Each structure stands twice: as C-alpha cells, then as structure tokens.
Amino acid sequence: MFLAGSGPLIRLSIFSFFIGISISLFLGTTIPFIFKRTDLIFKEISSGLILISPPIVLLILGTGDFTDILTPSSVGIIYGILSGLGVCYLVVRSAVIEISNQEFINASKLLGGKNLYIATRHIMPVVVPYAVSYMLASTTYGILAYGFASFYGQVGWTPNWGMMIYDAITYGSYLGGTNYWNLIPPTLGFTLCASSFYFLSLSVKKQFGISI
C-alpha cells in the first residue's frame, strides 16, 4: 500500500511542476515585456490566485460530482495552473521587469531585435531559475494539499498516503488505539517527499543567488 500510494504523488508532482513552470515562464516573460497593459490585468489576477487555498479548492470540487475525476493527474493540472498563474507568475514578472532595463536588452533593441525574440531568447533563459525554484516550492504545497484532501476522501479512491493515514486512525480505534505501524510510513513518506522538493528549491536559489 505504501509503494502503491507513492505513484499518485509522483504523477501529481510531475504534472504540477511542468504545467506550472510552462505557464509561468511563457506568460511571465512575454506579457510583462510585450503586452504591458495586459500585464496590469494579469497582475491583479495573480494576486487574487495567491489568496486561493488549494486544499479548499480540492475540498469544494470533491463535494460535488467531481470526486471520481479528481485523479492525481487532474489535481496536478489544477495545482499547476493555480501556481503558474499565481505566485510563480509574479516572481518571474518582477525578474523580467528588472532584467528588461539592463544594457544587453537595450543593445538588442538597437540592433533591431523583435520583442518576442528578445523575450524568448534573451530574457527567458535568465528567469528560468526563478520559475524552477518557486515551482519546486509550490509542488511541496501541492503534495501536502493532496494529502489533506485525500484524508477526507475528496479526491477519489486512488490508493494514496492520505487514505492510509485515515485508515490508521479510523480503523485503529476499533482495536483500542491508533495503528502506528500504518500511520508512521505514510507520514514519513509525505515528510520526505515534500522535503525533497523544498530542499531542491533552496539549492536552486542558493546556486543562482535568487533572493526574491
């Protein structure tokens, strides 16, 4: 059960990370640099998405008819969109605004470079570490949010560690206590899995000197 529960989290992490980083990199690079008026709208949307708690979103969706379709992949897509358009977009946006005033960008404009070419060839490679580091951190929160929702049975019946924790607490009461042999493995699994993404995020920030 422990090994079977690791599969959903791996799929969730992969979908969440790559979807979030794709959205934040492309939109966060092109919109602030090319479409500055549209950027004002996206800035407000992103600020609003930061206030939305992913566990609450999953609980709301799980109370309706969406429980069976809330697979780990679909949860990863939802969380990737929320993270990519939320905090990661704002982080990449602030880095793009700072970089767009540097000398090599002005030199590219003087040489006749198009805005889209400059954004994708000169600015995007510089802001990749920002998107990677913050999406790694956001994936950590996605793992915890999925565990929280799966504990309450709001994300379908896919075998996962949250369900193991629920079973250990619920069915352990019939034996006069908590089944610690069923509770400790998924708890350690959540801790180690979330910590791995968090420490990867810290290492990327330290390697590239990111202080935002």
State where each predicted segment sits.
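Transmembrane alpha-helix signature in integral membrane proteins
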Residues: 1-33, 193
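Glycine-rich helix-loop "coupling/hinge" segments at transmembrane-helix boundaries
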Residues: 145-184, 189
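Membrane-spanning helices that line or support transport/gating and their immediate boundary helices
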Residues: 25-29, 33, 37-44, 91, ...
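Non-cytoplasmic
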Residues: 59, 76, 84, 131-164
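Transmembrane alpha-helices
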Residues: 10-11, 15-19, 23, 116-149
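Generic hydrophobic transmembrane alpha-helix motif, especially the helices
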Residues: 38-89, 94-98, 132
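C-terminal transmembrane helix and the adjacent membrane-cytosol boundary/short C-terminal tail
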Residues: 64-70, 79-83, 136, 175-212
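Short cytoplasmic-facing helical segments at TM-TM junctions of multi-pass membrane proteins
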Residues: 91-123, 127
